[in-house]
Every structure is written in structure tokens, then in C-alpha cells.
């Protein structure tokens, strides 16, 4: 049993603890219970309350005697008898179950909706009948007055199957492309279906007409919520004649009064996960909403959180046992969850002993084995002068010594050595002073940059020095004394930012690896101290190391996920604060100062270009010909020739004039060599 408390509400997990394999014999099970404390203290409320791999849905019959659950693999349904606290029967199915409904007060009439469009009926003896619906189904509800089953799924139609006549009736045509969930009000029979567009359509089964539409997707968007996609309806539940709760795929729960199209309250789970199920707890006016990560219990009037439940594995379904404080969960694991919350109500009558058990735990919250006793050997008794108490009720024989009351031990110790407390006090003071001295010296050696990293490296080096396996452990160079990494502890640019996203995501993995390395060093030390034996140690099986490594991997994966969720929440809060600042900020025009000696002509040129673009082509050609940029001439064959001259800037004109003057100056300074004539050569000219 595991006890957790949130908002001073205690939650008892009755399904936690180690489970024994089925193939173990009774003798080995009893031996394990004697040796293992966790196995001995576990509570198996219902025998074999688990599935082979995963549990998908779980429900309780109306009379409260039977608990039915479906799961895989292979697809099956299991029925548990609460009066016998054991499994009553198990039936394997052809395909996985999407959802099911118990039509009778006990388990004698059950309807299953499969993921391959089949609808399967079971009676008390077993399989009874099977039929199919036109499209894949996602949910269904049973209307008791007319004996109609309403199926919704990947279609705009709501299929109706009458169980009295044994045939399909005309379907209800909705305005949605697909429907996800549905529910029927037990008081007045109103049928409601949740669509993929985020709407809830309400129908009257008596006249088969739509009587109202609620736009939940629009109402779920609030100032505090952050929605990135269109919310679809993922859960639907009626409470009484006028109340209805709607869960969306973005993690919001909306409470409606059927007389209004506006929600009374919008509750956000802050996880962004689809709402799996919604339940009402009338005695305390609570709403229990669950997604795949958490079950939240909050007040339906104010929305104030009452308590929450976060299991180890993802949730598939949640069932509240009627008129009690017991909660059943279907998880992504073989074990099905059983939780008892005494504040919600008493324990069911088939497990009324839970009330007495929880009361005893509340009276003795810290009662652990031998906490109030001191273990002493026979030599210790001789030193204390208590050998005459051997065999009396004051001493309890255990192994090679005795257990005695801790208060009696302190009294006798004080009488034998009155100055023991003073000596103990002086030793403690001396130890504290030595520790502070060691820390003081260590702090002086730490660099200015990356002090925590340097402290971690120093601790690892000290552990290596203390280790007795210096030959077996491969010695690695110390980063602190290596000149290649010297800048990392001197330059502030290399400071590790512990608030960055990369550090927070990698830190759980690094810490797990360091812990695993320390654990391996301790194990190697223990092995060297013991005699070298080829046989396996007795207290631990051969696959224990692999199981521990897998547990470590699961642990750091959960820590990384937790850090990622915290980062997302911090990012969401920053965006909300930035949005509030932007809303409060008043924008003002900005002015720019032009340097002295420059002329601002951008507006004028843009206005001139705009006027030029508004003119016709003929006017633009005339204007360009006037400025000399366009030259039109006729050719001999009757065609026209256009020559465009690009405008030059002032700088280009100045540069061209300077080049012209330079060429003229060089021409004047040049000495001509035309007066020099060479002699004519003899022979034929070279060709």
C-alpha cells in the first residue's frame, strides 16, 4: 500500500507493490513473502486483478457486485466477483474492444463495440450474437425506454439498433463530418453527441429532431488557455436533469446548464492532452476529469482543485465505484489501479476492512519495524551490567543479540557513564569544525567559473582515491589539471547555464549515469572484499542487473519528461506575460534625424514615380524623349529603332569628366614616335 497526500487529502494506492509470477509454486511464494518486506506488506484486494499487457476500459455493474474490464493481448474481457474477491470468468474475443456497456444489473447482458465495426452481444452463458455497423464506431449509448442502441463514429449519421425488434432504424443525420462520443440523460432521455468540429448536438429521441447545438470549441478559448488546434469533443457526461460536462481534445472541461448556451465554468488541465472521461461526485459537489496523465478532482461551482491523482502509467479509462470513495483505473500496464480516498466516501461493503486499516495508519503514521528498539549484543549487556535481564520481557532475543527499549537503553547508558553526553557533544562539535575546515579549504581551490562542475570533478577524484580498486578502475586524466580545459574554468563565456533548456533536459541523464557508475564501483569493492566465488550470490537472481538497469532507464526518462513539461509551462507563462505587456504597451511614432549636408528625397521620388506610373505609355515615351533617355529613329525597311540611354548619377558624371580630362592630359604629354622609321629588310616579307 502506498499513501500520498495532496491538499491534506490522503489517497491510498491498493494496487502498488511487486506482483508474484504465476508460475511460482506456493512454497516459493511463501518463502518470498518471508524474505521480501515489499511482498509481505502488499495488499492484493482482488486476486489476479490485471491484464496480460494493457487494460483499455473498466466498468462496474449496477448492483456493484461485478467489475468488468477489457484489454489485450489477446483481446479479452474479464469479470471479477467482488463478493469472492477473485476472477469469475474470462472470455477471449476476436478483435480489440473500443468500449462496452452493461445492459443488465449484473453481467448477464453485455454489448461490445469492436474496432472492426462488429457489435457483439454476450449473455450469462457466453457469446450470443454478432452484427456490423456501416462505419467504424467510436462510442454508443443505450436508451432504456425504447430499447435503442445509438452508435456514433466515423460518419455524420447516428445509427440506431432496436433490440426489441432486432433491426436497424432510420439513422439520425447530424451536421458534423464525424462524431466521437455520445451520452443519454437518465432523467429525461435527451441524447447528445460530440462532434469532431467541437460542437455538441442534442436530440430528442421521441421525435428524432435536433433540439439544440452548443459550440464548445469557441467557448473553450479563454484568455488563460493556449490552444494551437481546433478542439474536438472527446468526453461527454450528464449529471441530473440540467447539468452536462464536456471534455475537449485540448485538455479543457466545460460545465453547462442545458438552459444556456454559455458554459458555467471552463477548467483547463494545463497538459494539452485529450480528456478521457468525466464523472460527477454528488456528495461533495466534485467533478472527476481524467486525461492520459492525471485525474483531477475539483469543485464544480468554483473550479477550485480538491486533489489530484497521477499514476505511474498512462490512463485509458477511469471508473468511480458508486456510493464509495474507491476509484478504478485502466492503465497502459498489466496492473489495473485501485485507489481508496476516504474523504470521498466509505469503502464498499465487500472491502469494509479498508476503513479500519486506514484509521490505524492515521493513528500511527510513522510506525515502522523496530524504530523504538535498540539492538545490543551480549558484550554490550556486560558493559552496561544488564546480563541479569536476559530471558526477561525487557530483552527480545534476535539473531546474535537482543532488542531492548530505546528509552531503557538511554537511561542505563546515562547511569553507567554520566559524562557520555558531554563526550558525544564534544565529538560532534569537533566533527562539525573539521567539516567546515575541509569545506573552507575546498572552496579556496574552486575556480571562479563553473564552480559546481569543478566541485563535482573533485568529488569524483576523491572517490577514486578512496577506492581500493585502483588497478581495476582505469585512471583517466583530471580535467582540472589539464591545460587544454584551463580556459573553461577561467573565461566567463564558458559558464554553464543551468537555466537553459539543453542543460535541464540532459541533467537527469548525466546524474543517472554518474549514480550508475558509483553503484558499479561500490559493487566491485564488495566483490573484492568477499572471497572470489564462481557461484552466483544467493540473494539476487541473474537477471537482477538487467531489471535494475531498465528501472534506471525508466526513471531518467520520466525525469526528462518532467523537465520538458516544466519547460513548456514556463514558456507558456512567459508568452502570457509578454502578451499582457504587449496589450499594456502604447505604441508611439519614431523619428530619425538626418545628418547635416544630406537632403531627404525619398518621399518626393516615390511620389514622382507614382505619378509617372499613372501616365499612359505615350506620355511616358514623350517624357523620356524630352529628357534624352529615349531616341526613336526609322530604318530603311520601315521599322522603328528605339535607343534607351540610362540616366547617370552626379557621381558617375563627375567620374566620367575626370577620366576624360585625364585622357586629354596624357595625350598632351605623350611624345609621338611617328618620325622614327626603320630600315627596309631584305628578302621576302614574312606572311
Curated annotation (Swiss-Prot):
Pfam families: Beta-prop_NOL10_N, NOL10_2nd, NUC153. Residues 526-560, 643-687 are annotated as: Disordered. It comes from the Eukaryota. Residues 663-687 have a biased composition (Basic residues). InterPro entries: Beta-prop_NOL10_N (IPR056551), NOL10/Enp2 (IPR040382), NOL10_2nd (IPR056550), NUC153 (IPR012580), WD40/YVTN_repeat-like_dom_sf (IPR015943), WD40_repeat_dom_sf (IPR036322), WD40_rpt (IPR001680). Keywords: Acetylation, Coiled coil, Nucleus, Phosphoprotein, Repeat, WD repeat. The modification Phosphoserine is found at residues 25, 475, 514. Residues 423-476, 514-588, 639-672 form a coiled coil. Residues 647-662 have a biased composition (Basic and acidic residues). Its main location: nucleus. It is found in: Nucleus, Nucleolus. The modification Phosphothreonine is found at residue 481. The modification N-acetylmethionine is found at residue 1. Belongs to the WD repeat NOL10/ENP2 family. This is Nucleolar protein 10. The lineage of its organism: Eukaryota, Metazoa, Chordata, Craniata, Vertebrata. The gene is Nol10.
